[in-house]
């Protein structure tokens, strides 16, 4: 069994009052729809025309990671789990000029969007990550459903009833019902030759072994393909975001970092891609997610201006430490928060959001563009093991949810998986996903382009 990494110590936290939860959730409600009169919404007893039952009791005064089992209700043709819901009344009760919501959708949305479960859970895997198996998404089977968006849709329905006005979802460009963020973590540029060469040697195919070595010495590596990756996304009118890993030495725990060094030649190639409209961001190495000095040193290596984007190598993230490190370093956006083990919604939300700072009781200033699907998730002995023809059919229901709510589909496809030799989660599967996104009218945007459409926290 691989070693399990312990969570960091639980730091002091600010009280999480009903007002705190309401403010955080209504802020994101106002970002998901245009011109939302959030002042109309309050908890029962405050005389607001739209009231939400306060069903969380003293849950948020404690540090338990998991609430009681959710109550499942039908909403918008979908079975949706509602936490903090006793289920004794209809979900939404409408009378002239008023609306009552019997489930505490504010507390439920706050619980999921803030990442409460992983902040207060001690569960971590060998990479220091909160494991999918420990999540409520896994326990109740809703990882591919953006549950928080359904909660906000309940609020939307109530507001429309009270005001008589239709709330329009956020738009991403002329005629674009949702957005797509296409990204590539640059872990390996020099190692395509290793697996076939080792296989030839083990099998005793000495001629093949010699040919593999000769090709390695005389030809560019098949994974040294940044320009080809950029061209592949450009076919769909998209720009890629390349997350660059600045450390080539393994982490202290032996986990590999990059197989390349940041040479002047590589920087020239990246600069040329940036001039073509592609984006360069930081892929912070092993050991940076819990060390500000290490992280900020790498930020300065890769990002030549204040701000910029980040995704941590191996999706490492310690919820009690990492958000504060990102915030202190002045990063503009992050795109780490997805489960390595399963595609879907780690925070049950298909829009970007401002992570919650438990120490201050308010939102951080940096922006999270959650990760929905990673190529390695789809075909890996440790994760899912989808067949070559099963990838797109498995993803379409999740992608359709993002389209339904006008969210952002974040795709991570490593450059090494553009190698034609990869038939499991390789270029064919990537092009199938891109074709679906383009066919549904997605606006392809870089991380900075997405961030620029949102106000600061």
Regions found by a protein language model. Give the residues of each.
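Terminal accessory/targeting
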Residues: 1-260, 351, 358-457
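Catalytic domains of cell-wall/extracellular-matrix polysaccharide-remodeling enzymes
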Residues: 22, 26, 286-365, 411, ...
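Short, surface-exposed, charge-dense and proline/glycine-enriched linear segments
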Residues: 199-202, 270-280, 310-318, 334-346, ...
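Electropositive, surface-exposed helix/loop patches at the edges of structured domains
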Residues: 277-289, 294-297, 301-302, 312-330, ...
């Amino acid at each position: 069994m691989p070693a399990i990494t312990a969570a960091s110590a639980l730091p002091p936290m600010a009280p999480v009052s009903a007002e705190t939860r309401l403010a955080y959730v209504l802020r994101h409600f106002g970002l998901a729809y245009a011109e939302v009169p959030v002042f109309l919404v309050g908890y029962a007893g405050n005389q607001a025309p739209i009231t939400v039952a306060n069903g969380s009791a003293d849950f948020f005064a404690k540090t338990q990671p998991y609430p009681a089992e959710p109550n499942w209700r039908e909403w918008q043709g979908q079975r949706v789990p509602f936490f903090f819901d006793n289920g004794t009344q209809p979900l939404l009760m409408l009378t002239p000029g008023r609306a009552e919501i019997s489930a505490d959708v504010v507390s439920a949305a706050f619980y999921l969007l803030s990442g409460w479960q992983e902040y207060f859970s001690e569960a971590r895997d060998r990479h220091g990550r909160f494991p999918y198996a420990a999540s409520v998404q896994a326990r109740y089977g809703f990882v591919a459903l953006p549950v928080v968006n359904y909660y906000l849709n309940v609020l939307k329905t109530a507001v429309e009833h009270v005001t008589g006005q239709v709330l329009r979802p956020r738009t991403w460009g002329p005629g674009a019902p949702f957005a797509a963020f296409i990204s590539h973590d640059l872990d390996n540029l020099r190692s395509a030759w290793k697996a076939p060469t080792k296989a030839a040697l083990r099998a005793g195919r000495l001629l093949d072994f010699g040919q593999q070595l000769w090709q390695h010495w005389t030809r560019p590596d098949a994974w040294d393909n940044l320009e080809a990756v950029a061209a592949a996304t450009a076919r769909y009118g998209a720009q890629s975001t390349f997350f660059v890993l600045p450390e080539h030495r393994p982490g202290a725990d032996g986990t590999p970092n990059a197989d390349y060094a940041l040479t002047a030649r590589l920087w020239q190639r990246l600069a040329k891609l940036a001039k073509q409209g592609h984006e360069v961001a930081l892929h912070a190495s092993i050991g940076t997610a819990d060390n500000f000095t290490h992280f900020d040193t790498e930020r300065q290596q890769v990002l030549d201006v204040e701000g910029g984007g980040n995704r941590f190598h191996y999706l490492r993230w310690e919820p009690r430490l990492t958000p504060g490190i990102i915030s202190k370093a002045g990063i503009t956006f992050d795109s780490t928060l997805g489960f390595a083990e399963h595609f879907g919604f780690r925070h049950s939300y298909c829009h970007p959001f401002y992570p919650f700072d438990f120490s201050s009781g308010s939102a951080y200033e940096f922006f999270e563009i959650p990760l929905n699907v990673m190529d390695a998730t789809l075909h890996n002995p440790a994760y899912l093991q989808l067949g070559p023809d099963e990838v797109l059919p498995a993803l379409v229901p999740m992608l359709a949810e993002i389209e339904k709510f006008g969210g952002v589909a974040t795709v991570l496809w490593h450059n090494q998986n553009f190698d034609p030799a990869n038939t499991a989660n390789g270029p064919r599967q990537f092009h199938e996903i891109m074709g679906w996104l383009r066919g549904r009218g997605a606006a392809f945007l870089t991380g900075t382009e997405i961030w620029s459409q949102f106000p600061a926290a």
